[in-house]
């Protein structure tokens, strides 16, 4: 059901900065009248561009350009929407917005246009999020995945699961509410078979969603190690250009350096850090503190070791980084150990039986094996496997639904199977409906839409 907001909102819909064209968007009950007061005439033909002069409340010409109206409900937000398309100078656009506000509109909050579209059933929550993902896409693969989500591919998968659960709930709850009908859902095998099918389908969607999340977010990899282990050299080798300064002087890198690259369509967020050692230098100490802070936020830690150094146990971080024992004590993070400088030590490059990787960041030997390892541990199967984009909250919701379905299967043959199974099915449905926004807390909606652009 369409619901009209009491106020009219306005915002610049094009990117900040200078451009050939800039768009100011209005949405709400006064959108048409406010726009008419600016262009000096009634907006007669919906969805047709009209060339006009834009004037302020004193009648002074601010700019000239096109005006297009989209009366409710056939608009992006489901409300009356007007776009004023003028020249893309920031000052001109700011004056247009100020004129709209003076005429009765208010400045839109971040993501408020998309939020109104969601509340007016013009799109579900995954489609609304896909708009932001499409705008933020850093790779062709992530843009394609976001577009598929915007077109409803992810929503359709979730809705199919919900429909299957509703069918199961009807059958199970009928057996509970009408015992006189003698519906025996245990003996006929229907519920067990249907529940197993739904669980398998949910597991498949979860796998695809994980691929969609990887295409969207990628993996954050912190490169850590002692000074002069070759951390910055590895970052440069993976990036394909000199992102970091490399010298033979220990402690060259003193701050956190970031670079985003792609591994076959998967974003890899590289973080180069200061060499870990005891230092009296205040600046170096701050760099080391920041290195530990980045480790706590990373998806994976890559520990660089000079392959000429003797090692007792590559699986023991305290042996690899003895000076970091206290800081790493409670760090629960998957680790990849890389033995660098094979060109100097003479070691054969590639993966070792103990799980370490031998490389030469200087000449690139062993890097292909390391790249393949990073894709493997991330669970990335290739950009062709991501049919839609997904976020961490989607993964969490699908995991909750899967846990409820697995619990339901376990309840089938226990005492009070009907009541417990019905509760698990309700929990699974609730988790899935959080994805599309059928059941979503207001504070979650606020967090989601506040991350959008102002003009969306």
Curated annotation (Swiss-Prot):
Cofactor(s) in the UniProt record: K(+)
Enzyme Commission number: 3.6.-.-
Enzyme class: hydrolase
Domain TrmE-type G: start-end pairs: 218-379
GO biological process, one term: tRNA methylation
Chain positions recorded as Mg(2+) binding sites: 232, 253
Any Gene Ontology CC annotation: cytosol
Details of cofactor binding: Binds 1 potassium ion per subunit.
Keywords: Cytoplasm, GTP-binding, Hydrolase, Magnesium, Metal-binding, Nucleotide-binding, Potassium, tRNA processing
Binding site for K(+): 228, 247, 249, 252
Gene Ontology MF, one: GTP binding
Family: Belongs to the TRAFAC class TrmE-Era-EngA-EngB-Septin-like GTPase superfamily. TrmE GTPase family.
Function: Exhibits a very high intrinsic GTPase hydrolysis rate. Involved in the addition of a carboxymethylaminomethyl (cmnm) group at the wobble position (U34) of certain tRNAs, forming tRNA-cmnm(5)s(2)U34.
NCBIfam families for the chain: mnmE_trmE_thdF, PRK05291.1-3, small_GTP
Family matches, as HAMAP family: GTPase_MnmE
UniProt subunit comment: Homodimer. Heterotetramer of two MnmE and two MnmG subunits.
Protein name per Swiss-Prot or TrEMBL: tRNA modification GTPase MnmE
Species: Alcanivorax borkumensis (strain ATCC 700651 / DSM 11573 / NCIMB 13689 / SK2)
């Amino acid at each position: 059901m369409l619901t009209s907001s009491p106020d009219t909102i306005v915002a610049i819909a094009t990117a900040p900065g200078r451009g050939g064209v800039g768009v100011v968007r209005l949405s709400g009950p006064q959108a048409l009248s406010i726009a008419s007061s600016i262009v000096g005439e009634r907006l007669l033909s919906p969805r047709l561009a009209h060339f006009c002069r834009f004037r302020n409340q004193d009648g002074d010409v601010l700019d000239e350009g096109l005006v297009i109206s989209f009366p409710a409900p056939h608009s992006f937000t489901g409300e009356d929407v007007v776009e004023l398309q003028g020249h893309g100078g920031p000052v001109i656009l700011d004056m247009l917005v100020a004129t709209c506000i003076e005429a009765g509109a208010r400045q839109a909050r971040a993501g408020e246009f998309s939020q109104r579209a969601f509340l007016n059933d013009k799109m579900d929550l995954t489609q609304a999020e896909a708009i932001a993902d499409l705008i933020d896409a850093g790779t062709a693969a992530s843009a394609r995945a976001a577009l598929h989500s915007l077109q409803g591919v992810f929503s359709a998968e979730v809705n199919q699961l919900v429909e299957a659960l509703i069918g199961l709930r009807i059958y199970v709850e009928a057996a509970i509410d009408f015992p006189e009908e003698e519906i025996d859902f245990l003996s006929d095998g229907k519920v067990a078979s249907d529940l197993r099918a739904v669980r398998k389908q949910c597991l498949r969607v979860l796998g695809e969603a994980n691929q969609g999340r990887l295409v969207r977010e990628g993996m954050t990899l912190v490169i850590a190690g002692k000074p002069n282990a070759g951390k910055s050299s590895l970052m440069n080798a993976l990036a394909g250009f000199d992102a970091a300064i490399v010298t033979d002087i220990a402690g060259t890198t003193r701050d956190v350096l970031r670079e985003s690259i792609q591994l076959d369509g998967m974003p890899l967020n590289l973080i180069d850090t200061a060499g870990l050692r005891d230092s009296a230098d205040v600046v170096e100490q701050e760099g080391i503190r920041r290195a530990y802070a980045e480790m706590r936020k990373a998806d994976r830690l890559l520990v660089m070791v000079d392959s000429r150094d003797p090692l007792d146990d590559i699986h023991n971080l305290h042996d690899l980084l003895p000076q970091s024992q206290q800081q790493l004590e409670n760090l629960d993070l998957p680790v990849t150990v890389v033995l660098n400088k094979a060109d100097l030590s003479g070691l054969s490059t590639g993966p070792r039986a103990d799980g370490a990787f031998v490389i030469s960041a200087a000449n690139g030997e062993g890097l292909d094996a390391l790249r393949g390892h990073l894709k493997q541990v991330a669970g990335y199967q290739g950009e062709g496997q991501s049919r839609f984009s997904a976020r961490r909250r989607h993964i969490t919701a699908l995991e909750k639904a899967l846990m409820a379905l697995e619990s339901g299967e376990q309840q089938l043959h226990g005492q009070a199977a009907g009541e417990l199974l019905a509760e698990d099915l309700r929990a699974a449905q609730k988790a899935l409906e959080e994805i599309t926004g059928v059941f979503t807390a207001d504070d979650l909606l606020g967090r989601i839409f506040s991350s959008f652009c102002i003009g969306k």
